Amino acid sequence: MRLSPSLIRWLGALCIGLSASSQAATPWVQAGDLTARHHIEALQSQGCLKGVTLSWPISWAALMKGYRLALAQQAPDQASACKNQHSAYLQKALEATRQAATGAQLTLGGATQEPLYTSFSSQVEDEATGQIALYSMGEHWAANLAVGYVDGERDDTHLRFDDTYLAGIVGNWQLGVGAIDRWWGPGWQSSLALSNNARPVPGLWISRHMPLAPESPWLSWIGPWDLQVIAGQLEKDRAVPKARLLGARFVFNPLDSLQIGLTRLAQWGGEGRPQDLDAFWNAVIGRDNGQTSGLKEGQDPSNQIAGLDFRLSLTPGDVPVGLYGQFMGEDEAGGMPSKFSSLAGLDMVTGLGQGSQRVFLEATETVAGSW
């Protein structure tokens, strides 16, 4: 099936109209919401938001808690300065989410060609897409049933359930099952860990609901922290069919201006690969490199990457500026990641006219071990 360019443009226009009139409610700011991220990062750089912003999605509850904590710790004039266009945008977006707690959303889109580059912003990558979603959200739970159809050349899976999830809050932890986009890292154009460049992986997850600082005097230096653990099922159309994706990410905020993230991802098991408890334990402890672990050929339990990233937020001359980097090791040496790929960038917020703009310069080196 092939659609004409004129029909695709008509569908895209219809999609814009429908999306403008119906905003689905979610308990978090989704990976791909570029405008919301712009305002969130600006508030964090200005000292108007406590918490971490290196793992997406981010819950609305955590954002508003971090905003209130920042205001409470500031002098009256500084707190007044934080009530700006960035906080106003988030307040308006949160109110729209609350008012649309239950409903349905229809999204249509299309593209005449795949984009040359992808980024944090959500974008259509197939010739024609359509999705209908039924959603509902309560105080401690949220659910979304999304059924989509895609006509394109990226893969042969036309019927999809991407963006479907069921999540709930237990204590200060969020438990969920489903397939949602994730973005792990500080980059605007790319991420060396998880990103929305690929389709979301269906699976289970657990993450902190409120990334508050530890109360212990021994650990308070960590500052606000977040932990996310995921376990997903990959598809069969790959070198090792039906492998599992396991991942963990820890982000902490030791200084108001500095965030540090630690990430580990592993492809484990799958057809023709060991996937018993011994193989799982070998993957956990990093004994999965056949050249150094003593395992025989074909017994490597997993394929892993691990690394760190950071974001340093500054305000020279009251201009929000961010310096960030990400380093992911493709191999292991001495129990630590090695053969790194890297990403580095600089971003700045400007205030031309009545709005705000963000300019960034970002470079990525994806050749492992190039430095």
Model-flagged regions — what are they?
Residues G17-S21:
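N-terminal signal peptide c-region/cleavage motif recognized by signal peptidases
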Residues V124-W221:
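Well-ordered mid-protein domain cores that form the structural environment of catalytic cofactors
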Residues V29, V52-W56, A75-S80, K92-G103, ...:
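Short loop/turn motifs that connect adjacent beta-strands in outer-membrane beta-barrel proteins
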Residues M1-L11:
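Bacterial N-terminal signal peptides that target proteins for export
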Residues A104-S121, A142-E153, L175-W183, G187-S191, ...:
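Transmembrane beta-strand segments that form the barrel wall of outer-membrane beta-barrel proteins
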Residues Q23-S122:
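N-terminal periplasmic/intermembrane-space "pro-region" immediately following the signal or transit peptide
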Residues G203-W371:
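Signature for the C-terminal beta-barrel architecture of outer-membrane proteins
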Residues V52-T53, Y117-Q123, D151-D155, L192-S195, ...:
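Outer-membrane beta-barrel domain signature
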